[in-house]
């Protein structure tokens, strides 16, 4: 079972899907916990459902049904128990793996069999893109998984501008070789004209206070 932080974002889903496909190829049953009602990856989620991942996702409220004594819980992009999408699953699982790049907090998960922590990595998606290369050619991600991983990296690095290193670009090059289409990934970040205009209105209303831009929004903007 793969899970991440509450209110799933692109780096979490990218890392989850990046692990899902190779693990499934190994003949293991694997599920990704995703709250379909409250997440920030609706466009990528819908796209993955059309690309063969329709059975990959489960809701948090039914995740416990998939947990047994032998279940391995892989937690990505978070390392504190109270931020996990399904904390009750974590409490029940005896075998836990953590993959995260954030600075270690005081209340970190201390019972993991593997705690893969790399604060110099740009994102959890980058870390997973590196890990799956060691699985061998037989268990490599498909193009859909590669695009999900690349999308996660692009979001966390602001299109490869912030927090990038040599390994970031090496991971991106690997995903490109695995079939990731950069044009399709870019489309995941596209918004409608209406949403763009609404954002522009918000930005134009910003007030500068102590070198910070502050906006007041009275309605929800996608």
Residue ranges of model-derived segments:
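Active-site cofactor/cluster-binding pocket
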Residues: 54-114
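Hydrophobic helix-and-loop "lid/oligomerization" segment in the mid-to-C-terminal part
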Residues: 1-6, 13-49, 64-65, 69-72, ...
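Short alpha-helices
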Residues: 101-171
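Short, hinge-like loop/turn segments at secondary-structure boundaries
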Residues: 47-52, 115-118
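Divalent metal-coordination and catalytic microenvironments
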Residues: 9, 19, 74, 100, ...
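Short, basic, helix/turn surface patches
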Residues: 56-65, 127-132, 212
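Alpha-helix N-cap/helix-initiation motif
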Residues: 9-12, 117
